[in-house]
């Protein structure tokens, strides 16, 4: 009896190792993607003086959640089937200030040579019937372990603060009503989604106007400091103002 138990345990050990590697590969994929995103954040902060990424969250689905999805989709209960059939085990959500930031970040990630774009769904240009908006991408990235190279799917969701607030509230309401939301609440959520879109557009318009003013101010400051042969000269207003007036009037 003891010998049989030991044999069973020995047989289970390779399976346990594979299960551990399987789940860890998704954690490693998140680590890789988070590194890429953090590099972009640092570059924007220090080089471009603007960071389009407000914050980032991530998660790996629990084995229980994976099992429920397998049963719902009718997939075989095997690691190979899970890997190919379920592409959102590893997930990252990027929250941006403005809608234009969403597409800029998406393009920057897609241009990276080790990232393969599997699928892209634009729920901003084509919102879901309930009003949900977000940009979804399924990416595949290489993960290098001690004895193998694996290619892992990661789901990326990119949305604005307003879109995220709406989605978070809708999610809570959805489960509060046990997935049966009254029509009146659905209509109000749809109106709120439209308001969120209008808010995003308004805030982006203000942001662009502020940037234009800032650029003009910077140009003004730059005019007052001339660099000639590595020697810096200050241009006084009494000299600069009539020169500018004559230039713009000509």
Where on the chain are the PLM-derived regions?
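Terminal, regulation- and interaction-focused segments at domain boundaries
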Residues: 89-96
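An acidic, glycine-/histidine-flanked metal-binding catalytic module
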Residues: 2-30, 34-43, 155-250
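Long beta-strand-rich cores associated with HINT superfamily self-processing modules
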Residues: 83, 96-205
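Short, charged low-complexity intrinsically disordered segments located at boundaries
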Residues: 60-70, 96-101, 135-142, 203-204, ...
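Charged, alpha-helix-enriched surfaces in structured cytosolic catalytic cores
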Residues: 24, 28, 61, 65, ...
